[in-house]
Amino acid sequence: MISAIIWRVKIKISVITVSYNSVKTITDTLNAVAMQAYTDVEHLVIDGASKDGTLGIVRSHSNPQIRLISEPDKGIYDAMNKGLALASGEIVGFLNSDDFYADATVLAKIANAFQDPAVDACYADLVYVTQDNSRVVRYWKSKPFTKGDFAKGWCPAHPTFYVRRSVIERLGYFDQSYKLAADVELMMRYLELGQVRAAYIPHVLVRMRLGGATNQSWKNIVQQNKEIFTALRKNGIPFSIMWFLLNKVVSRLWQFAVGRVRRHH
């Protein structure tokens, strides 16, 4: 049981939420962090100068862990990089402004993974849900990382990816030349090239609403894959486009099939 864990070292976790006009969903995100059993947490909300009431919700929230920064940005990865620069926790991760944690033990599970000093990063499973959170649509089941996995179309779910700040300082921030795949490129750079030792937590940690930028259209999906191919080449990772796409399609079909099964149980 998480409640029975005694941490040898209390580790501060910085959770970064990037927002822009998120009035319909950000309350769930703020509440998800505030309800966590693990409390050594900093919640950074990096807002892009929202105009719809988002700022009022954040400012009125009772959680003292929240730090709000609101100013125009150059896009989501610019905002994420601002969060990385401001984070004071030893461990850093992201929770999107329309996503939320699966339960109150998520950050405790993450803190527990980092009790092992050999662990530099961790990631877990994620489910996609409908806008009203009434049903699971897709189950993103991950696995332990093996070198070469990114060339096969594999990638951890970025909202479940937490990493030591010392690793970020060593290996760098999001590359903003990528418009849809900077998160994939960062994890690729860390795991494939940076020899970051990552622990896989075999639990669903995040519930993600459908409708993210990458999944909004086939055009964006194609563009993201093109950017991933660019990232693979840039990072010197050999790959076959056909093998990459075949593996990715099979993986996605399986994820939707499992999501369908979970929906009916």
Report the location of each language-model feature.
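Conserved nucleotide-sugar donor-binding catalytic segment
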Residues: A124, W140-E227
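Short aromatic/hydrophobic "clamp" motif used to bind/position activated sugar donors
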Residues: V92
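Glycine-rich, basic loop-to-helix element that forms the pyrophosphate-binding segment
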Residues: E71-A87
